[in-house]
Amino acid sequence: MTKGPVRLDVAVSYALPRAGLPSAVSFRKWVAAALKGRIREADLAVRVVDEKEGCSLNHHYRGKDYATNVLSFPAELPEGLPKGIKMPLLGDLVICAPVVAREAAEQGKSLAAHYAHLTVHGTLHLLGWDHEDDKEAEAMEQLEREILADLGIDDPYAGEH
């Protein structure tokens, strides 16, 4: 765990009208909560998209023919950088607004809480966390619960296991 302040630059863009969507300030708060104590500085982008763009990206990068709630694209350091140079670029998150809204309604969660959860979840993926097996999934879900609790948000997995 790192201590001290986090230097954070979160660029938020919207590919659809912003009415009813979280503000850039909210996304920054959720990303900062996920990074707290883990890294000291980071640059990342959050893009909120419609279903068409979400489906296109999910198809192109994952071979899936549907839009998913969040996609994480970790940054890769360019080849040839001198040793010792560290780039704070963490990566990009793509969040599909219609999928998030549908899931929140189906799961009986507030829209803001679901956006917060998916932003934290995606940010943890950028840090290298995954849920490919049960042990990884349990560890990642527990960390998400702790981060969201610090934000005053209920356990997003309550009732699932």
UniProtKB/Swiss-Prot annotation:
Q: What's an example GO BP annotation here? A: rRNA processing
> Gene3D superfamilies in the record, alphabetically?
Metalloproteases ('zincins'), catalytic domain
Q: Name one GO cellular component term.
A: cytoplasm
Q: What is its main location?
A: cytoplasm
Tell me which cofactor or cofactors this protein depends on: Zn(2+)
**EC number(s) given by UniProt:** 3.1.-.-
Give the matching InterPro entries.
Answer: MetalPrtase_cat_dom_sf_prd, YbeY, YbeY_CS
Q: Binding residues for Zn(2+), per the UniProt record?
A: H121, H125, H131
Q: How is the cofactor bound?
A: Binds 1 zinc ion.
Alphabetized Pfam families for the sequence:
YbeY
Location in the cell reads: Cytoplasm
Q: Which family does it belong to?
A: Belongs to the endoribonuclease YbeY family.
Q: What does this protein do?
A: Single strand-specific metallo-endoribonuclease involved in late-stage 70S ribosome quality control and in maturation of the 3' terminus of the 16S rRNA.
Q: What's this protein's name?
A: Endoribonuclease YbeY
Per the UniProt entry, what species is this protein from, by scientific name? Xanthomonas axonopodis pv. citri (strain 306)
GN (gene name): ybeY
